Swiss-Prot record:
Gene (name only): secA
Protein name: Protein translocase subunit SecA
Key word DNA repair present: no
CDD domains: DEXDc_SecA, SF2_C_secA
Cofactor info, note text: May bind 1 zinc ion per subunit.
Native organism: Herminiimonas arsenicoxydans
EC annotation from Swiss-Prot or TrEMBL: 7.4.2.8
Length: 921
């Protein structure tokens, strides 16, 4: 600790000291609040609203509003906010992250800033990780808000459009991060302002903020539609990977690395990548030629075969890096992704880039079509749009730097209401998995015999089922809580604190539900209270009996040492390990935790296995004897820090690339919204039309050029064939030899204006305006979709620019900007061409066309939180080479040579120029 910190205290201590003053103010108001009748207390809400409407600052009413909310909670929920919860509430109100331990009452704490900020009438979003928690918290806390005169809504995926609008128009809206993000994207795809559901993004309180803003920040939200069908190709390519062999070892430029066993491909588990060797390329080409997929003598890297190599790599990754019951499960003839952080099934989500189809081919299930992106956004860019953002979690301090760097959110560690009594024991490291599971079984048996509840955290469904099998053989009753049955997870977790309870849970399944020592009787009490057949006296007696039974069980568990946590493997993030430990020792309860590891575990095998194995061999450790030493724990923590730093780099790089698309997204969505809100777009259409025809004219009649350079015949032909305008500029020049080019352009614009007005006259200005708006929206949407695909292709190959001494990020920004300019020109051309060439006979035709345009965008739509594949550090997102960084300081020089139509496109996509940027040029 530095001298300055000792004198002035840390930033955290200074903030807490500042908030303590306000806590004293709130506590001083408590006696006065207790004296108020229910009606007088409820009348405070409209009073606060009025004061805010008159211009009073929201911070000035904070002490009084918090005091009102606390008093209302005492009366309605029979729960009083602790002082530390008041501090947490202030932390959230000031747009920071509150780190509070498990069981410290984050849900209740959030009511304070939510109530205060909802008084503005602009809406507050409370964001949770799943629908169950959103529904539970909205019902639970909604009674408090309702009593105080505020409305509460729940935004879930299965509710209809009208219900969503009601939810968003409530003062407080609970929902999941995915649903809030998808609603934003959907709102920017509507064809009528009345179809929007969201209001302006004012204030969001994010529960489990580390899970949402960090773990899921590498996976963009994507709305997609079906692209062309490659089912047959996936099936054929699926036969190739089993014919290829893995190469062990790899030659390195420094000569240290050597090939131990030659093979056709190399696998890098750390980077989650597979690469073909030279021999592998040749072998794959021979196999594909025999299959008839590759022409005789052709190369996989020919421009015409670019889709073939894309499919081959997808199949290789599916076979070598993605494993059943670890990365996915097969259910109802479908491949369902397993969330690597929570172990939950991510139903409806699909890996992108053809990987999901490759896994489907591998498993022999029905292959669903590839998708085309219609709209996408990352959580980073979505949540940064809120005027004020706050979050709460039990574990944020390890990621405080990232929260500050990416979101500008400061992390405040809130002191515990009662001191933590949990004992975190030293890791035990075994040579093999068998020894590790044997030691865990002994520990679980010991706890079971003493009546101590155990929660075992696993990193995959496969491990949880393996451990379940071991416990079944030992005749130990237990519950398995994994992604295959998460509907029951809250119920199982709530009872995981009963004596002798053994619960196996994948990672953080059941997060958000407290484990109460002795079990949770709240649900049974609710059933008794809801039973109208019982008198009040009988209800009280039965509830009392339940309470006494619970107290007895609670005391029994406390005497046995509280909840014991067993970790079967260290996660690559220290935070996830801390979350598992944090399930024990809530509210000052006793508890303990221990991680059992083996050298076969993924993290140890990849990062620290050789070092630890060398230590064990040197010490001549006997079979079944663990290492329990600080040096090993430090090695593991060092490995975790490396992975965390790498993952942070990936997220930061992803954000820097997505910021380019985000700036463009804002422009497109803003223009789209202006279009929706404009009733008559004829002025805009006129401006576009005149611009397009002026550009067309200048292509054939350059400014300040001689008459000999004009190509009026070609221009006349294009006007007649492409634009259906029967007007000859060549004839005009022949009739008036002295006419200037400016006068000719003016004449052309008069003719096009007249053709346009003739169309409008057939159906009337009002009807045609709706059609024009529909055409513009449809053109913006379709070209934006194509642009997103072009950006994806650009990003996939951009890392190669590092080898040409160029900074890939700068190159990406420059080319993305050029593509955006080309897209805007394409939109203008498409709109003007449609409006000028459409044939209209009646108003009914125009109404039908308008309806068709509005419907075109909603067919075959899928919603994915597309797995960006967080483990794969894509080369394009990692700093390519040292040369690239040197190139960053060099001025940008356009050195692009003249490209032939059939040459590979210089953007790096691998396509022919005429099929890529040449199509846009």
């Amino acid at each position: 600790m530095s001298l300055l910190t000792q004198i002035f205290g840390s930033r955290n201590q200074r903030l807490l000291k500042q908030y303590q003053k306000t806590v004293r103010e709130i506590n001083a108001l408590e006696p006065a609040m207790e004296q108020l009748s229910d009606a007088a207390l409820q009348a405070k809400t409209p009073e606060f609203k009025e004061r805010l409407a008159k211009g009073e600052d929201i911070d000035s009413i904070l002490p009084e509003a918090f005091a009102v909310c606390r008093e209302a909670s005492k009366r309605v929920l029979k729960m009083r906010h602790f002082d530390v919860q008041l501090i947490g509430g202030m932390t959230l109100h000031y747009g920071k992250i509150a780190e509070m331990g498990t069981g410290e009452g984050k849900t209740l704490m959030a009511t304070l800033p939510t109530y205060l900020n909802a008084l503005t009438g602009k809406g507050v979003h409370v964001v949770t990780v799943n629908d169950y928690l959103a529904q539970r918290d909205a019902e639970w806390m909604g009674t408090l808000y309702g009593w105080l005169g505020l409305s509460t809504g729940v935004n879930m995926s299965q509710i209809d459009h009208d219900a969503k609008q009601i939810a968003y128009n409530s003062d407080i809206t609970y929902g999941t991060n995915n649903e809030f993000g998808f609603d934003y994207l959907r709102d920017n795809m509507v064809y009528d302002t009345a179809d929007r559901v969201q209001r302006d993004l004012h204030f969001a309180v994010v529960d489990e903020v580390d899970s949402i803003l960090i773990d899921e920040a590498r996976t963009p939200l994507i709305i997609s539609g079906q692209a062309e069908n490659h089912t047959e190709l996936y099936h054929k390519i699926n036969a190739v990977p089993p014919l290829l062999t893995l190469q062990i070892g790899e030659e390195t430029p420094d000569g240290k690395g050597t090939v131990e066993v030659p093979g056709d491909y190399t696998k890098d588990e750390k980077a989650h990548q597979v690469l073909l060797t030279e021999a592998g390329h040749e072998k794959a080409e021979q196999i594909l030629t025999r299959m008839g997929l590759l022409p005789e003598g052709a190369s996989l890297y020919d421009a015409a075969n670019i889709t073939l190599i894309h499919h081959l790599y997808a199949a290789l990754r599916a076979h070598t890096l993605y494993h059943k019951d670890q990365h996915y499960v097969v259910q109802n003839d479908e491949v369902v992704i397993v969330d690597e952080f929570t172990g939950r099934l991510m139903t409806g989500r699909r890996w992108s880039d053809g990987l999901h189809q490759a896994v489907e081919a591998k498993e022999g299930v029905r292959i669903q079509n590839e998708n085309q992106t219609l709209a996408s956004i990352t959580f980073q860019n979505y949540f940064r749009m809120y005027s004020k953002l706050a979050g709460m979690t039990g574990t944020a301090d390890t990621e405080a730097y990232e929260f500050q760097e990416i979101y500008g959110l400061e992390t405040v560690v809130i002191p515990q209401n009662r001191p933590n009594q949990r004992k975190d024991r030293q890791d035990q490291v075994y040579k093999s998995s068998e020894e590790k599971y044997g030691a865990m079984l002994k520990d679980i048996q010991d706890c079971y015999e003493r009546g101590q509840p155990v929660l075992v955290g696993t990193t995959s469904i496969e491990n949880s089922e393996l451990l379940s099998g071991i416990l079944n053989k030992a005749n130990l009753p237990h519950n398995v809580l994994n992604a295959k049955q998460h509907a029951r997870e809250a119920e199982i977790i709530a009872q995981a604190g009963r004596p002798k309870a053994i619960t196996i849970a994948t990672n953080m399944a059941g997060r958000g539900t407290d484990i109460v020592l002795g079990g949770n009787v709240a649900k049974q009490v609710q059933i008794i209270e809801a039973n109208d057949a019982l008198s009040e006296a009988e209800k009280t007696a039965q509830a009392q009996k339940l309470g006494d039974e619970w107290q007895s069980l609670h005391d029994q568990v406390v005497a046995a040492g509280g909840l014991h946590i067993i970790g079967t493997e260290r996660h690559e993030s220290r935070r996830v390990d801390n979350q598992l430990r944090g399930r024990a020792g809530r509210q000052g309860d006793p508890g303990s935790s221990r991680f059992y590891l083996s050298l076969d575990d993924a993290l140890l095998r990849i990062f620290a296995g050789d070092r630890v194995r060398a230590i064990m061999d040197r010490l001549k450790m006997p079979e079944g004897e663990p290492i329990e030493a600080g040096i090993v724990s430090r090695s593991i923590e060092s490995a975790q820090r490396k992975v965390e730093a790498r993952n942070f780099d990936i997220r930061k790089q992803l954000l820097e690339y997505d910021d380019v698309a985000n700036d463009q997204r804002k422009v497109i969505y803003q223009q789209r919204n202006e279009l929706l809100e404009t009733q008559d777009v004829s002025e805009l259409i006129t401006s576009l039309r005149q611009g397009v025809f002026a550009d067309l004219f200048r292509t054939y009649v350059p400014e300040q050029s001689m008459e000999e350079q004009w190509d009026l015949k070609a221009l006349d032909e294009i006007l007649r064939n492409e634009w259906q305008i029967d007007f000859s500029l060549a004839a005009v020049l022949e009739a008036e030899p002295n006419i200037t080019d400016e006068e000719m352009l003016e004449r052309l614009l008069q003719v096009t204006d007249a053709a346009y007005e003739a169309k409008v006259a057939i159906v009337g200005r009002e009807s045609f305006a709706g059609f024009e708006r529909g055409v513009m929206l449809q053109s913006v949407d379709s070209n934006w979709r194509e642009h997103l695909a072009a950006l994806d292709h650009l990003r996939q190959g951009i890392h190669l620019r590092g080898y040409a001494q160029k900074n890939p990020k700068q190159e990406y920004k420059r080319e993305a900007f050029e593509l955006f300019g080309q897209m805007l020109n394409l939109i203008k051309d498409a709109v003007v061409k449609t409006v000028m060439t459409v044939r209209i006979q009646s108003r009914e035709e125009i109404d039908a066309a308008e309806e068709q345009l509005a419907q075109a965008h909603v067919e075959n739509v899928h919603y994915q939180h597309a797995d960006f594949d967080p483990d794969a550090a894509p080369e394009e997102l990692l700093a390519p080479t040292a040369q690239a960084h040197e190139a960053a300081s060099q001025p940008q020089v356009n050195t692009m040579p003249k490209v032939g139509r059939n040459d590979p496109c210089p953007c790096g996509s691998g396509k022919k120029y005429k099929q890529c940027h040449g199509r846009l040029a």
